[in-house]
Amino acid sequence: LFSSWLYTEPEGARRLLRYRYLTLPKAKEKAAQYGCEGALFPWESAWITDGEVTPSEGAPDVVTGKPIPIYTGTQEIHVNADIAYAVHRYFEATDDTAFMEECGYEMILETALYWASRAEWNEERKQYEIHGVIGPDEYSEHVSNNAYTNYMASWNINEALRILERLLQAGKTDLLEALEEKTGAVSREVWMKDRAEKLALPKPDGRGIIPQDEAFLNLPELDLTPFKKGGRKILESFNVEQLCGYQVLKQADVVMLLSSMPDLFPEDIILKNYQYYEARCVHDSSLSFNVHSMTAARLGMTEESFRLFRKAAGVDLNGGLSSAEGIHGGNGRNLAVYRSGVRRIIGKGWVSCDGTPSAGILAKCFIFIRLERRKV
């Protein structure tokens, strides 16, 4: 959703980030509540003084009949790095130094402090690890070293270190003093660097597959044919606790990492992971089809990309009728300019967007898509 604002209405993107900045005091309270430094932004946020508003329970469990416990508010902490990354992308696209000096630098430093204090040292492995989390895939709870979470945390800490170095090189001593007074991060540079250098970052195994978390690749398989092709909802047959014991994804996780940071791994690794995780993903989140669609487009899988794009575009138009409770605005990412620079994928006129924007350059993109209604 943020991308669609950033590359069509950057002032709207600025307001979204400004809202997050106004919630920073509550985010610092939440981090302290869990014994951490810095700031931990809420998974679900409302008014700026509300803090975390994620409910602790949901609908009745299909197996037990009891309310489903909801752990996202305490475990889906990758939102912290996601917000920091959004700040980075905003500055990268707009060169809005005033915003960074007023809000952005502070947000990135505070979130970096959280990650550095959240990581736990494993003496046997000689590395820092992040335990008890939910990555983007919400059918995997209480996991350790989720790839998306750890790589984004690593980026967050390293970006904070890069900011401190740039400001020092630019002679911004007054700004550094102000940031130290607000965050205490300037004097913790060596401490943060140690965490960044030793944080566990899951690597591809012998097959080239990046472990979604420490347990995922060792879990048994589940035949997903009835759910991927038969139209059945997996939560009508299993509860989330059961699904945590299988190689089943609710939504893009490793593929989300590869979509957000495609330069982390070579294309052959991206392809292997796309194929592996697409086969195990039931796309029960409206935010999943679009991520897989963009990744397939980057890989030159034109028909696959367009098939998934149509599914994403039809979330509020096809069966299910869940849009009565609100439309799925996050799918705007699939229709927006995804960074600047365009790579045309030849084949059926499909176009995807790729690249890194130059500072100060914005694109307004108007995409007209004709979806044909075909007779069955």
Task: Please give the residue ranges for each predicted region.
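Active-site core of glycosidic bond-cleaving carbohydrate-active enzymes
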Residues: 1-26, 76, 80-85, 102, ...
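Helix-terminus loop motifs that line ligand-binding clefts
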Residues: 11-85, 91, 97-102, 111, ...
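Acidic/polar loop patches that form or flank catalytic/metal-binding clefts of enzymes
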Residues: 12-17, 28-31, 162-174, 304, ...
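Short coil/turn linking the two alpha-helices of tandem helical-hairpin repeats
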Residues: 91-92, 300
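Conserved functional hotspot residues or short segments at active or partner-binding sites
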Residues: 108
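Acidic/histidine-rich catalytic neighborhood
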Residues: 114-183
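Short beta-alpha connecting loops at secondary-structure transitions
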Residues: 134-145, 316-328
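Terminal accessory carbohydrate-recognition/targeting modules of carbohydrate-active enzymes
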Residues: 301, 344-376
